[in-house]
């Protein structure tokens, strides 16, 4: 509460001081834009008002301060990237409505035996695979009750110390796998789509789904393996096997009943959507090229992943289904629109409007002039610095809001360095998903901490190690992979 109060006072007083007494590049418009950026930064970091409310500030202040017209500012709040987000959420909600996500998770868990190490590996794979396509929060909320039931059964024949170690290993594996899984696809988590929009703005090209996955998938797999090794060494050694754990998973599967026709239909739509996303733009790695399906259509250049997402989401309102009580319905109905995360949609728009203001006011050009000293810094050191800074920032702030704030600054930095913005924007985006230390860092961390089974100091202890590993892996693999996958 105190943080919010301080944020509210500072978020108003400091921008007023900047407008009245500071001079950014000798331009009043630049100073006004800097004041708006500072206000939004403080409000987003302290959450003095809701994040979505802060995102609406440009619509009010930009026209009043002469930065941009209402019409031009409002246009930033809705674009194809936002529709990709909305379409992806609708498909994810269909999976949740018909319990397809739970069936997928339990089938993955059933493959692994009753040994704690194998079970944790199963939880990590199930969580990561689901969070690639549905929200990290929804995935964690679904996996947590299953994990708690297994913990309750397993701790009956363990010592208190063994039970606590197993609890830590299993619950932390869910939180961290949800975050890492989200980074591996373009729709897995909001910062990825923020990157996609900014990349489109600066390059006039869309980010291909396969292009993203060729970069993020190897990094994500490397991080998951590292997570598994670290958690196994810290918490899962010398724990006994148990056939009861497998029986519990099998029991959960039986409760779901038979694979319904509605689940099959949602699965077919989901697989078709994923295939269309991945193959739309084709695959280009060095001299290796495969044409995407859109290149064979008369107006294929007008289609993007947002078009695919909305088309497939709309299709589910037409496909008939039988409800759990035998009633006739469709895969989705009008209720889904009340379940969409509209605050995140507004948060996206606010970030894009902020970036638009940076360009329109000349603040981006001013920042580029001030960053001339970075020319002497080596590229790898710069990537490492950006990755580290982003990782630390997102430990205490919203990763989506932070990504929105940082992108315009990274664009200015890249301009000074005379390099492609991808070198800085991509590692920053990936590291935004790797805040492992504090409960407030990510929704999965907060949900797992909210179970009451983990102390803050226990999360910090393993989180510090994993943060360092994530920074090194993302920096190193970005430096190595970007030249092969992106035009730099």
What is the meaning of each model-derived region?
Residues 8-22, 36-46, 59-64, 87-93, ...:
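Hydrophobic core segments of alpha-helical transmembrane domains in multi-pass membrane transport
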Residues 80-90, 132-143, 213-229, 301-312, ...:
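Alpha-helical transmembrane segments
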Residues 21, 39, 52-161, 327-331, ...:
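Membrane-embedded alpha-helical segments and adjacent helix-loop junctions characteristic
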Residues 2-21, 97-100, 136, 158-177, ...:
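Juxtamembrane and boundary regions of transmembrane helices in multi-pass small-molecule transporters
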Residues 24-29, 39-56, 73, 137, ...:
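Flexible hinge motifs at transmembrane-helix junctions and intramembrane kinks/re-entrant loops
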Residues 2-3, 24-31, 43-44, 71-80, ...:
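Interfacial loop-to-helix junctions that mark the boundaries of transmembrane helices
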Residues 57-59, 138-152, 171, 184-201, ...:
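Re-entrant/interfacial helical elements at transmembrane boundaries that shape
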Residues 156-157, 217, 345-364, 377-488:
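C-terminal transmembrane helix pair
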